[in-house]
Amino acid sequence: LDLAGVLGLDTDIDRRALQHYTVLQYVPEPETLHRGVRRLESGCYAMIRPDCPPEVTRYFRPRFSAVGFAAGTEQARYDEITAVLEDSVAKHMRADVTVGAFLSGGIDSTAIAALAIRHNPNLITFTTGFEREGFSEVDVAVASAEAIGARHITKVVSQSEFVAALPEIVWYLDEPVADPALVPLFFIAREARKHVKVVLSGEGADELFGGYTIYREPLSLRGFNYLPRSVRATLGRASQPLPEGMRGKSLLHRGSLTLEERYYGNARSFSDEQLRAVLPDFNPAWTHTDVTAAIYAQSRGWDPVARMQHLDLFTWLRGDILVKADKMTMANSLELRVPFLDPEVFAVASRLPFDQKITRTTTKYALRRALEPIVPPHVLNRAKLGFPVPIRHWLRAGELMDWAYGTIERSAAGGLINLPAVRIMLDEHRLGGADHSRRLWTVLIFLLWYAIFVERSVVPKISEPHYPVRL
């Protein structure tokens, strides 16, 4: 912001970008929250000449081009996945410093760690959890580390630590990202940096191999494809008066929509009515299609799961997953490497057909088959959890709830956010009348960002390095 001011750029808040953030939980590229500032998009370069506007050119255009499995070739295709992933991990292990690995209770990070230990028998793995029961992958991660023979280190985060770290975390983010998982990631990166300088992690596997449960939605909605558009529209209208949470309401509503209308990533938590209540400048013309229409235009004719994956590469992955991974690790001077996002791995994953990614009972089908010889059985078919965060419970009692009320009361962002409406939402959540945790978190992170970078009423205390420093 200081540089923007020196350059004379317009740093007023961009209301449209704020609305996009509230819907998506991140600010989509190339937008920023400042009207006069834009970002160079991932996969692009800019040519700047005197007295000319910047010329932006995209050099990377990922495509999903499914190639069906010929009879008798299934195992060969699974072996191809294994081989290319083994090669990627080997390349990412090359370093003049010690390399470790993040290890949750899921298949992706476990696969990376299991392959990495072949190159470093002294591999250290790291995981994090919370004091609250039910919000920890620690036991599964410990069992996985033991199964592959890795030394394992765990960091358990208390509610007090969680709250105290928030200003520093948002300061390092530079922009609001409303993913609660970035907090445990910050702590495990800090712990890992005491022992290693580089870590491998499992980001990207879900987007490449079809790992999100929502990717199964085209199967559950397949019957709607046989109905005339007018009938689907009638069913959609019929769903509107049904009470929220009523069985079948969401199915009827989503089945009445096209893929482009209903799917814009993993993050939606606000309805339009809730957005109107929270955003004084809510504009119904500012929709997710501002972000997604051009991306969907590139994938016409692909199967629906491939189109969803492609959209997530350009939105969720680059706007949330990789931002939080990169910034939380670099905040602790730790280099993060992501073997699943190697171009050769993508080349293999992008050729998988629909039925090798999603079935009615599982996700990442081909990847699971390919990893059967590598990943311990207790992890192979385990449901996806990631780093679960207990914000729903902590926003109902304790230090995080107190911090939330204080953040709302002290905020000077009333021209951008309807603070009394947010206070009512927090009251409803606290009393158990509704689960507003993700909506509250989205707004609270923005308010904290605003307090740090615009109001300057919050000055984060930046921690000293948590690793030996040679003077």
Regions found by a protein language model. Name each.
Residues 1-173, 185, 189, 372-373, ...:
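Cysteine-centered catalytic environments shared across enzyme families
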Residues 167-171, 193, 215-217, 394-396:
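Short low-complexity, flexible loop/linker segments enriched in glycine and/or proline
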Residues 175-179:
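Acceptor-substrate binding/catalytic loop of class I
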Residues 6-10, 15, 32-42, 51-53, ...:
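Adenosyl-5′-phosphate
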Residues 2-3, 107-108, 131-133, 160, ...:
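Short, solvent-exposed loop/turn segments at secondary-structure junctions
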Residues 187-245, 316, 321-345:
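Active-site adenylate/phosphate-handling loop in enzymes that bind or generate adenylated species
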Residues 116-120, 216, 353:
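Active-site catalytic pocket residues across diverse enzymes, especially alpha/beta-hydrolases
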Residues 15, 22, 228, 241, ...:
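Extreme N-terminus nucleophile/cap motif
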